[in-house]
Amino acid sequence: LLGKKCHALRIASYQAQTEGWLAEHMLIVGIESPEGDVHYLACAFPSQCGKTNLAMLIPPESHKGWKVWTLGDDIAWMHLDDEGQLRAINPEAGLFGVVPGTNRNTNPNACDAISNKTIFTNVAVTANNDPWWEDKETGEPVTDWQGKPCDLAKGPAAHPNSRFTVSAKNNPSYSNLAEAPEGVPISALVFGGRRRELAPLVYQAKNWAHGVLVGASVASETTAAATGQVGIVRRDPMAMKPFCGYNFADYWNHWLSFEERSSKLPKIFHVNWFRRDADDRFLWPGFGENLRVLRWIIDRCEGLVDADELPIGHLPKAGTIDVSGLDVSPETLEQLLAVDPEQWREEMKDIGEYLQSYGERLPERLRAEHEKIVQALS
């Protein structure tokens, strides 16, 4: 992990600041409509929030004619072209994904990609010397990831952060523009995290500076992939906490500076696939059905749908997210999009304390955007 992140993010993020571009912990995905229109999204999620699954998404049966193209699942280098359009490339040649949980239901493209010419690390092994991991649909492990005889009663056979490494060209949804030197034009930047409550399924930032605040305040419930501890909410700005090569306050200032350089910047959104009900069940089906949310994001980028304006941002109006054919009732959708003012007042207080920890280096514009939301919620 260290080797690939050191230059592609840690060193590159600082180089990007000095040269006027961005090196980000983001997937790049192309969404093609049945009419052949393609929108490219760059999305940043902390560890274990479904980046690889989203990058390799397969449209559900209800979305015949839609196509999803993978350009990258982890890192995006982005620059403004001569017209002020933000464009992205993926500097990596391969995919490096968490393997437990990968199967035909969760990520069919990944299963096809890792069926040959793949390096597996810290997985269990079957009697035939095949790799095995939790939620794999075939085989039985005989040796665990530490090389010991496997006993599933004592814990996972594969390490929770065991990985696959494979050429991106093994992926059936690999985009023919993945290696285009000029990059692809980004329509939307999407942040997200794993939150049981609080964050709605999707909302849009009101402007670029508000979007930078949304990215700066990304938080997720920790998973084994990140820390070995589970369920603790931790701030992970732009999903770059482990990877930013310089002070975050200066990094946010660099993001804010793009507004002075272009009037064509992408719109910024936040998603949360992981909201749960009172019985701790996921409210949203996720996986391929996330395309329905991405379609709303694209509709907003094209100005095709109106939204409700709340203190935290623009939320979908009733009927603008297509849930036809899903087991998602109007009441469930209402829960998914609910914004609890009291919870958000607490959240903004926590975000404020986090931002203040950066002292005088914190950009005034970010402080002002935060204060606007605090006032609107009060």
Show the residue positions of the predicted features:
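Pre-Walker A adenine-sensing motif
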Residues: 25-33
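Glycine-rich phosphate-binding P-loop
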Residues: 38-62
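Short beta-strand-centered segment that lines the nucleotide-binding/catalytic pocket of NTP-utilizing
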Residues: 64-80
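A short alpha/beta connector and helix-capping loop motif
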Residues: 83-95
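Conserved NTP phosphate-binding and transfer environment spanning the P-loop NTPase/kinase superfamily
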Residues: 98-378
